[in-house]
């Protein structure tokens, strides 16, 4: 796996050198470095993470309206420690930029900020507002369902997942995140296994959780 991620970063590094004004290429390079950081040792992961941040920042500099790049940089700032260039103040500033481009995404970003600060009531309000603004976007429902599950409100979470599955019956993301929620909560494990098996038979995109992650989750659901 590490070899695959190295090939990806090497190829994308060449791509940005040939197309230095491409915001999207820098975005993809940042994602590749991020995946490489996740799979790396504790000694090399910080270096890879820093390269991911630099690529995301460059992508946003090149195109201030590249919402995917802004979102990825927001997530980096939200989750990374300060010594790696993260920080809630930086994330909050980016959330305001997101608001200028997409109101639903803005409320999702605000929800994550409040959740990070353990202000769960405010976070829920923003998650629900994001759903109201984009009722046909299945991702907004998944976000709300995952949040509710994390709060221990499993029945409410399952009802929202059911709503998402009716909206997009064959969505791989719904299958995966619903199954993962069941496994994390230790409930409906038989159903989780069926969902994961369907997921593994689906046509996945690079934006979907990896097959390896789904297989690992399936083994966990079976007690392995």
Segments from the language model and where they lie:
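Register position in tetratricopeptide repeats
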Residues: 1, 35, 39-42, 79-80, ...
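Short coil turns that delineate tetratricopeptide repeat
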Residues: 20, 64, 100-103, 135, ...
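Helix-start (N-cap) detector for alpha-helical repeat units in TPR-like alpha-solenoids
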Residues: 23-24, 67-68, 103-106, 138-139, ...
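Terminal, low-structured helical/coil segments at or just beyond the last alpha-helical repeat
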Residues: 86-89, 97-117, 181-224
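Canonical positions in the second alpha-helix
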Residues: 14-15, 58-59, 95-98, 129-130, ...
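TPR-repeat structural position
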Residues: 5, 39, 49, 88, ...
């Amino acid at each position: 796996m590490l070899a695959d991620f190295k090939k990806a970063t090497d190829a994308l590094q060449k791509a940005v050198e040939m197309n230095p004004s491409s915001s999207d290429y820098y975005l993809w390079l940042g994602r590749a470095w991020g995946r490489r950081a996740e799979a790396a040792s504790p000694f090399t992961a910080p270096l890879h993470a820093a390269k991911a941040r630099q690529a995301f920042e460059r992508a946003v500099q090149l195109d201030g309206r590249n919402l995917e790049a802004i979102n990825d940089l927001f997530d980096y700032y939200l989750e990374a420690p300060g010594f790696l260039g993260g920080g809630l103040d930086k994330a909050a500033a980016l959330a305001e930029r997101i608001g200028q481009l997409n109101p639903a995404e803005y409320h999702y970003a605000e929800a994550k900020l409040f959740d990070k600060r353990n202000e769960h009531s405010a976070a829920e309000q923003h998650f629900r507002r994001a759903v109201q603004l984009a009722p046909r976007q299945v991702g907004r429902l998944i976000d709300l369902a995952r949040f509710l599950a994390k709060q221990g409100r499993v029945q409410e979470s399952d009802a929202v997942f059911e709503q998402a599955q009716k909206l997009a019956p064959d969505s791989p993301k719904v299958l995966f995140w619903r199954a993962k929620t069941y496994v994390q909560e230790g409930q409906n494990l038989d159903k989780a296994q069926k969902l994961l098996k369907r997921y593994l038979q689906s046509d996945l995109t690079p934006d979907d959780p990896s097959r390896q992650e789904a297989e690992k989750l399936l083994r966990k659901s079976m007690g392995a």
